[in-house]
Amino acid sequence: MIAGTRGSRLALVQTNHVIEMLSEVCKEKIEKKIIKTKGDRIRDSQLYSMDSRGLFTRELDMAVLNEEVDLAVHSLKDVPSDLDPDLAIAAVPPRESPAEVLVSRLDWEDLPQGSKLGTSSLRREAFCNHHQKNFKMEPLRGNIDTRIRKVMDGEVHATIMAEAGLKRLGLEEHIKRRFPVEYFTPAAGQGALAVITRADSELISSIGRITHHPSLQEVTAEKTLLRELGAGCQCPLGVIGRATGNQLTLYAVLLTREGEMLRKVTVRGPLAEAEDIGKKAAKEMEDYI
């Protein structure tokens, strides 16, 4: 069995984690194949200034469809909401923290007005503006190590990152502040992984054994909301699903780039009805997109 992956340190750690889990449920030996994506090649553009759908996944998905690899491991937030019908999300392992964190030498309240905040995320820019942080936004792309180095070297004063990536790489010492998800709401699927296969693959049932169903239902609701709204990186939308027992709560926030609150919704329902919960939240937000 061959697993396709991007070549970054984080992608390899994530793929190795999935391979370890699969090795406990599959007898086949699994090898990695590194595939470079368009997002890996383009480093000088803001994500929201281009069509970002499949930016970090398309080449891997094509390798799956062309049977060059048997599966691909993605950060679920990068997976398009309208996945190719010939592909399937075969597994969603247990989700890591979906939270956003501050990486900086100074804490959130101590960053002065005019501080340079590095980000290429319209959502993160909007949430900073919403909290009346008069930062100077600086484009910041690159892998996790590169972004941390630019903060530590003083090229920017701070950046906002996904806690999951830092934890997976053992870089928690760089976290200055962990934000509550209601204060700085993450991207859909943040912290989760997706194992992609062909929709007709015989491997789906065995790979699916590593799925963590509460995590799957959380991200299903989040991604359904995005799909129904047709929202992507060009839309400053934060959304988080939280499973508690057999119940699911979906919380979503839509801002303008300047940080004005357009709509905030909370929808609750049975965990098994995650897609319907996402659709209901989208219905409550559709007039504001």
Swiss-Prot record:
GO cellular component: cytoplasm
Positions of transmembrane segments: none
Additional free-text comment from the UniProt record: The porphobilinogen subunits are added to the dipyrromethane group.
Metabolic or biological pathway: Porphyrin-containing compound metabolism; protoporphyrin-IX biosynthesis; coproporphyrinogen-III from 5-aminolevulinate: step 2/4
PANTHER family: PORPHOBILINOGEN DEAMINASE
Pfam families found in the cross-reference section: Porphobil_deam, Porphobil_deamC
Modification type S-(dipyrrolylmethanemethyl)cysteine: residues: 233
Higher taxonomy: Archaea, Methanobacteriati, Methanobacteriota, Methanomada group, Methanobacteria
Reactions that this protein is recorded to catalyse: 4 porphobilinogen + H2O = hydroxymethylbilane + 4 NH4(+)
Cofactor note: Binds 1 dipyrromethane group covalently.
Protein family (similarity comment): Belongs to the HMBS family.
Gene Ontology molecular function terms on file: hydroxymethylbilane synthase activity
Protein name: Probable porphobilinogen deaminase
Cofactor(s) in the UniProt record: dipyrromethane
Function as written in the Swiss-Prot or TrEMBL entry: Tetrapolymerization of the monopyrrole PBG into the hydroxymethylbilane pre-uroporphyrinogen in several discrete steps.
Entry EC no(s): 2.5.1.61
InterPro entries listed in its UniProt record: HemC, Porphobilin_deaminase_cofac_BS, Porphobilin_deaminase_N, Porphobilinogen_deaminase_C, Porphobilinogen_deaminase_C_sf
